[in-house]
Amino acid sequence: MDCGLYIITDEILAPGCSHIQIAKESLSGGAKIIQLRDKRRNAAELYAIAQEIRSLCTQHHARFIVNDRLDIALAVQADGVHLGQDDLPLSAARLLAPRPFIIGVSVGTVEEAVLAEKGGADYLGVGPVYPTGTKADAGPAVGPGLIRSIRERVAIPIIAIGGINLTNAGDVLAAGADGIAVISAVICSPDIAAASRKFADLMIHS
């Protein structure tokens, strides 16, 4: 899986900015993966939003991932779904969505990472690397050291997430991350496209 700048949409953190607008501006700034994350909207609303983002990602040759909602991901022919430890079990998701459909899994320990790879995950979301206020149930920060430890044990791509900004992103990549997932450092910026471009440029030169 080709990694790069991975943007997660969140309308709560970016009031007045829709999922579609976040995706559009992030893609114009060089994002390679967009994840739609919304725990509030009903299925019909999410489906309509996901269709729009799917189209945008296709235009920009980027991947589109849906958080948690495998049904929505399959319905709009998204590239994949991202699952947390308390979401639909990886084994069940893989039965419903064989490869090349992408399944990413959030992990916070080496053991979870190894199990996810063995279970058929295509990439790992590792974090929170640094303290973050983006996700209330994110747990304690694990630091770049966990990325190094996981990198030694698994072969699938690692996407680092949690408290990542332009100051610490280089350290995360140096620790072995294949990509970085960014939320507030981009979507809370007054210029989402410009903020995305800075991260994309940093990754190219790291």
UniProtKB/Swiss-Prot annotation:
GO terms for molecular function: magnesium ion binding; thiamine-phosphate diphosphorylase activity. Mg(2+) binds at residues 68, 87. The keyword Lipoprotein does not apply. Keywords: Magnesium, Metal-binding, Thiamine biosynthesis, Transferase. Its EC number is 2.5.1.3. Condenses 4-methyl-5-(beta-hydroxyethyl)thiazole monophosphate (THZ-P) and 2-methyl-4-amino-5-hydroxymethyl pyrimidine pyrophosphate (HMP-PP) to form thiamine monophosphate (TMP). Belongs to the thiamine-phosphate synthase family. This is Thiamine-phosphate synthase.
